[in-house]
A protein has these predicted regions:
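Active-site-proximal cap/lid insertion segments
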Residues: 1-196
Length: 196
């Protein structure tokens, strides 16, 4: 269905369930378990969410990992004195990539970031609904993740990760021709492992 998004649908269903449960048993607590599809591949999200990140990853994964690490230190996520590990030898330096590779790989990360942000907004809709019911202070939210960054896209990312899993080579030229399809139902894309 044109415009369909699993995460929107899951939150719509969760909100509907909370409302129905509240109508049937208003004095009983509710339990909702919601497992969004994000941010596993395929990375599908509307263009407006991808556009929010246009150009934000052009500096490349070497600079990006340093910036993220600095933010984590400043926020206390990493203990003071922690040092950033070396980039793995099997991940190429961003500056060693061609301009076309950098353009494609930046775009792949823009799609991922848009998908993650869209998912966060959907979880936010659920939280706002609980607030609108006056149940926010009486609700426990538990957020868990089964994985962190993913290397499923391989060294060069993938227009269709099934290619990666089946050892089918993808060409930079073909993926550049399809760059505008990344994030759409036409693609089953994933970013290169340099971003992981």
């Amino acid at each position: 269905e044109q415009g369909y998004n699993l995460n929107v649908d899951l939150v719509d269903d969760a909100i509907g369930w909370i409302n129905r449960q509240g109508s049937v048993s208003p004095d009983k607590p509710f339990f909702v378990y919601m497992a969004p599809g994000a941010v596993h591949a395929p990375l599908h999200v509307n263009q407006e969410w991808i556009d929010k990140f246009q150009g934000q990853f052009n500096q490349g994964w070497d600079t990006w990992r340093e910036e993220v690490f600095a933010r984590q230190l400043a926020a206390g996520v990493m203990p003071a004195g922690t040092t950033l590990s070396e980039r793995p030898h099997w991940v190429p330096a961003w500056d060693s990539l061609s301009a076309d590779e950098r353009r494609l790989y930046s775009r792949m990360m823009e799609v991922y970031a848009g998908f993650l942000t869209h998912t966060d907004a959907q979880v936010g809709r659920l939280v706002e609904h609980v607030k609108s019911l006056g149940e926010f202070d009486n609700t426990i939210f538990v957020v868990m993740s089964d994985n962190g960054a993913s290397a499923e896209g391989g060294p060069k990312g993938s227009y269709n990760e099934v290619f990666f899993f089946n050892f089918v080579p993808e060409s930079l030229e073909e993926n550049l021709k399809r760059i505008d399809l990344l994030g759409t139902p036409e693609a089953h894309n994933h970013y290169p492992w340099g971003w992981a």
